[in-house]
């Protein structure tokens, strides 16, 4: 149990330094303007255009690799990226199991990680433990200790309510 965990629960975050690991899959958080401009991975862009992905707020599109395995995901931020700052909480409920990293986003990296952590919360005290869901690598540009403390505190407050 980490020093910031008040109630023992699985962490929604990948162990460090997962951000640079080859096993960590990218999430491109994009707006419709990013798709139009083609400002991210070419294969993911081609898949988004072929699938008609519009980057609506909270929309998710899984991107296959050439080998047919999962290669990443596109996450919509809505028009001009002006979305709710904690929209990444939806990623915690919609991404498949595995380790993920935010590859591109107009939302601050710490805000994306905090949103993901808060979205991963589940009250499970009287239930069977759920299977491990997706885990997010906290970006190096974000304050990991602060994010861990905040997610633990919010989780405790939710448990007490």
Q: Positions of the model-derived regions?
A:
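N-terminal hydrophobic/helix-forming segments and targeting peptides
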Residues: 1-161
């Amino acid at each position: 149990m980490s020093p910031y965990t008040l109630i023992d629960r699985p962490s929604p975050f990948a162990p460090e330094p997962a951000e640079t690991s080859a096993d960590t899959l990218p999430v491109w958080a994009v707006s419709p303007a990013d798709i139009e401009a083609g400002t991210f991975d070419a294969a993911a862009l081609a898949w988004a255009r072929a699938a008609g992905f519009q980057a609506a707020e909270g929309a998710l599109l899984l991107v296959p690799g050439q080998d047919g395995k999962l290669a990443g995901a596109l996450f919509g931020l809505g028009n001009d990226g002006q979305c709710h700052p904690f929209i990444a909480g939806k990623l915690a409920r919609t991404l498949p199991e595995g380790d993920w990293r935010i590859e591109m986003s107009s939302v601050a990296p710490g805000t994306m990680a905090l949103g993901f952590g808060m979205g991963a919360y589940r009250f499970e005290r009287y239930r069977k433990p759920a299977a491990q869901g997706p885990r997010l690598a906290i970006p190096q540009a974000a304050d990991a200790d602060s994010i861990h403390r905040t997610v633990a505190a919010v989780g405790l407050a939710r448990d007490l309510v």
